[in-house]
A protein has these predicted regions:
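Short hydrophobic alpha-helices and adjacent helix-cap/hinge residues
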Residues: 1-333
Length: 333
């Protein structure tokens, strides 16, 4: 072998060795230091989706070597349904010098981004397109401090209306319980979907749980056969209350997640929660291990699940079509 070739090979080998040794040292140091993880949600910290995201994320991080009480400190900031609190809560997390903020939903992510100066933000269950909302340059290359999970809630709500109409084939009127974050585009798509299905849809926007009963009363007075609950983290922990209000008024409900059907909604339809929760933890672990959020693609769910609660349907004296039940991933009897 020529001397120049030998030197080149040795030099390349040394560079590779230095790279892998450096990476190993970084990962070792990553697990030795104490990491600070912030959690920002517009809802309640321990209810519905937010609570489950927290639990699953901590389990995933523990599997990756980051454990509470050893090298991880967890900070929770929950707005309890009051969106006006999010900016101050985000500021508190930044002042606590967290290394990563998990933001449940677009509004929380925007508050975290405004409050921070480069703190990595992991979107968890963002309903709106992060590119259109200015949180990322593109899904493939976010280009900033925000990455994570996005699902097209606008289209998914339209699909829920289709499913509710299919489950209640004689129903001609439906209600839509919406959060204050309702966008014009979502309303337009739902209106078009309702027109295509030949049904009418009445929308009621509620600011807090105190407004639920009045909205359900209005739906009942309008003759609604069922109520579509808008996909929103604000509603994710309220399935038992929705079930009670709807059952008392003789109406079916379709909610955002399969677990909401288990908790009392007649139907639940949405992305596969188990996979999305674990993915949130995976993003955090990768950032702890040195990944740049600007280079971590924002992902969309590839699997959706439909759950039907026959116990609730029986209370409503509702016979769900056999063909419809055959499509369900889970039937609660």
């Amino acid at each position: 072998m020529r001397r120049r070739e030998f030197i080149t090979l040795v030099g390349s080998g040394l560079l590779a060795l230095v790279f892998f040794v450096g990476l190993a040292i970084f990962r070792a140091n990553a697990q030795e230091r104490t990491w600070r993880l912030g959690f920002l949600t517009p809802g309640a910290a321990d209810a519905g989706t937010p609570g489950n995201v927290r639990e699953t994320t901590l389990r995933v991080l523990a599997d990756r070597g980051f454990s509470e009480g050893r090298n991880l400190t967890y900070f929770s900031a929950a707005a309890e349904g009051d969106l006006s609190r999010l900016p101050q809560l985000a500021k508190m997390l930044v002042e606590a010098r967290v290394d990563v903020i998990i933001a449940v939903g677009t509004v929380a992510a925007r508050a975290a981004l405004t409050a921070s100066t480069g703190t990595p933000i992991v979107l968890s269950f963002a309903a709106e397109d992060p590119v259109k909302t200015g949180l990322a340059a593109s899904l493939a290359h976010p280009g900033g401090s925000v990455t994570g999970i996005f699902f097209r809630a606008i289209e998914t709500d339209a699909k829920r209306l289709e499913l509710l109409s299919e489950a209640l084939p004689t129903g001609r009127k439906f209600g839509f319980l919406a959060a204050p974050t309702l966008e014009a585009q979502r309303s337009e798509i739902l209106a078009r979907t309702a027109a295509t299905l030949g049904v009418s849809l009445t929308t009621r926007i509620v600011e807090s749980p105190a407004g639920y009963a009045g909205a359900f009363d209005a739906f009942r007075a309008d003759g609604a056969a069922g109520v579509l609950i808008m996909g929103s983290t604000i509603f994710s922990g309220d399935a038992p209350l929705f079930s009670q209000l709807a059952t008392e008024r003789g109406m079916a409900t379709i909610c955002e997640w399969d677990y909401m059907a288990r908790a009392g909604c007649t139907l639940g339809f949405g992305p596969d929660l188990v996979g999305l929760r674990r993915l949130t933890g995976d993003y955090v672990a990768r950032i702890f291990n040195g990944a740049n959020p600007a280079e971590l693609p924002i992902q969309l769910p590839d699997r959706f699940t439909l759950a039907a609660n026959l116990r609730v349907a029986d209370k409503l004296k509702l016979q769900l079509p056999t063909v419809f039940l055959a499509r369900a991933d889970e039937v609660i009897e």
